[in-house]
Amino acid sequence: MDRIEGQIEERGHWGSKAEFLLAVAGNVIGLGNVWRFPYLCYKYGGGAFLIPYLVFVVTCGVPLFLLETSMGQYTQEGGITCWHRLCPLAEGIGYAGQLILLYSCMYYIVILSWALFYLISSFSSQLPWASCDNTWNTDDCVNLAAKNLTLNRTTLINSTPAATEFWERRVLSLSGGIEEIGRINWEILLCLIAMWVICYFCIWKGVKSTGKVVYFTATFPYVMLLVLLIRGLTLPGALQGIVFYLYPEPARLFDPQVWLEAGAQILFSYSVSVGTLTVLASYNKYNNNCYRDSLWLCVLNSCTSLVAGFAVFSVLGFMAQEQGIPIAEVAESGPGLAFIAYPQAVAMMPLPQLWAVCFFIMIILLGLDTQFVSMEAVTTSVMDLFPMILRREGRREIFILLFCLTCFLGQFIMVTEGGIYVFQLFDYYACNGACVLFLSVFESLVMGWIFGAERMFDIIEDMTKSRPNYIFMLCWKYLTPLVSVVSFVCSMVEYTPLTFNRWYVYPDWAYALGWLLALSSIVLVPGWALGQLFAGKGSLKQRWRHLCSPDPELPLTCKQRAEMKETTFTAEMEDLVRANID
C-alpha cells in the first residue's frame, strides 16, 4: 500500500507569486475586454454606463473574486472538491461551473483559429480583405479602403464591404442556416489543430509549464495594446471616436437592459462563479495575501477594459471619418469588431500589414491564456476528484491529451460551412450570463449563510494577517445574492431568441437545443442537493446538518486553535475539580 501511495505525485504550487498573478490576469483579461466592454459602453450610455458597471464591480465582481480565491487557497482543492470540503450540499455548484467551462473550451478556441487565419493572411503583399478582385468576391463588393472612393448611403446599403465578404465567404464559407452544415473548411481546421497543440503544451506539465508560459502570454498583449493605442490616437478622427465612446447619456440609466449588460460583463470579465479562480488560487501557499491580490487584479481588469475602449474607438472614429458616415454605422461588438470593423479600418492605414499583424497577435494572446487556463481549471478539478488514478507519473499528460481530443471532436461541426450557427448557440445559451448569475446566487448564499461569512472572514484573516473590509460580509450575505437574483429574473423576462446577422431566425429545434445547453448546468445545482438529501442516511434534519458541515480535516485558523485550547483547558480543569471532590 505504501508503495502505491508513493507513486502519487504532489499537487504542487506556483513557482512564485508573479506566476499566480500573471495566470489570473491572463485568464480574466481576455477578448471581452477588447471587443465587448467598449461596445457596451458606447451603446448603453457612454460614460453613464460606468455607473451600473461600478455598482456591479462593488456588489458582485470584487466580493465573488475574493471569495473564490480565498476558497481555493484555503482548501488547496479544485473547483469541485473544494465545495465537497466546505459544504457538500453545494457540490453541484462546482459541477455546474466545470460544465460551463467545458462548453467554453469547446467554442472559445474556434475564435483563436479564425484569428490565426487572419494573422497568416496579414503577411500577404495585399491584405485579402482590402480588395474586390478575389475569387470569393461578388459583384456587390465595394472596397472601402480604395483611394478617391466616393460613397453615398444608397451605395453602402446596396453593396457589401470587402472585409465582410472575406469574413463571410472566405473564412466562414457561410451557409444558409444551421440546417445546411456543408463542407469542412480545411484551412480553419488546420488553424484549430495548431491552437489545440499550443494549448496542450502550455498546460501539459501543470503549473510548472503554465506558470512559465504566462510570463509571455499575459504581458505581451499589453505591449500590442499600447502600440495600437498610440497609433489609434494619432489618426485623424480619433477624438470624434473617443467622444462617441464616452459621451454620457444619463437617461439610459433607467433602461433595465443597461444594468443587465453591466452585470453580465462583470461576471464574464472577472471569471467568477465557474471555479477558475478557485483552481488557480489552490496552487498558492496558505499564507499568500489573496486579499490584496484580488483587489489589485480587479482594478487591473477594469482599467484594461477602459483603455482598450480608447484603442478601439479611436480607430473606429478614423474609419468613420474616412468613409464620411456616422460612427454608429461602423461600431461593432464581438467577432464583428475583431474580424470585420477593425481589419477594415487597418486596411485604410499606411503600412496596413504591420497593424494587422499587431492586432491579431494581440487577439490570439488575449484569448490563448483564457483558453488554456480554463483547460487547466477543468483538468485540475477532475484530477482532484480522482487523485489515486490521475495523479500518477505520465497520466496527467495522457488525460489532458484525451480532454483536448474530446473537445476537438465535439467542436468539429464548428469549422463547417454552417459552423458559425452552432458557435452562436454555444455562445448565447451554454455560456450565457443567466447561467453564471444563477451560480453566483447560490455561491454567495451558501458561503454567506451556511458556511458562514464570519468564518470566511476569520479564514482570510488567518491566511493574510489582515481582516477584509466589512462591506464584503454585507455583499456575501445580502447584496451579491440580491443583485444576482434580480439580474437573473430580469434576464429571463427580457429574453429574446437568438438571431444571426439580424436576419436569420433559427428553427425551433435549435432553440430547444440551446435551452438544453443552458439548463444542463443550471439543474445540476438543485439536482445535486436534492439527490444527496434523498440518498443520505438518518432523518432529514441529520442529513441536512451533515451535508452543511465542512470537512473537519480543513486547516484550523488561529482563532479556532485558541478556542480549542480554551475548551480543552476548561474541560481539564473541570475534570481536575471533579477528581478533587471525589
Language-model segments: what does each one mean?
Residues 1-16, 207, 211-375, 379-412, ...:
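Membrane-embedded translocation segments of transport machinery
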Residues 1-35, 64-69, 79, 83, ...:
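Membrane-interface "cap" regions at the ends of multi-pass membrane proteins
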Residues 2, 16-55, 66, 203-209, ...:
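Transmembrane helix-boundary motif of multi-pass solute transporters/channels
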Residues 2-3, 36-51, 64-95, 118-136, ...:
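Flexible loop linkers connecting adjacent transmembrane helices
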Residues 22-32, 104, 109, 153-172, ...:
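Hydrophobic, membrane-embedded alpha-helices of multi-pass small-molecule transporters
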Residues 38-54, 76, 85-88, 208-217, ...:
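Transmembrane helix-loop boundary segments of multi-pass membrane transporters
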Residues 108, 412-414, 424-447, 468-582:
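A generic transmembrane alpha-helix motif of multi-pass inner-membrane proteins
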Residues 109-180, 237-252, 319-344, 438-441, ...:
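Extracellular/lumenal N-termini and interhelical loops of multi-pass eukaryotic membrane proteins
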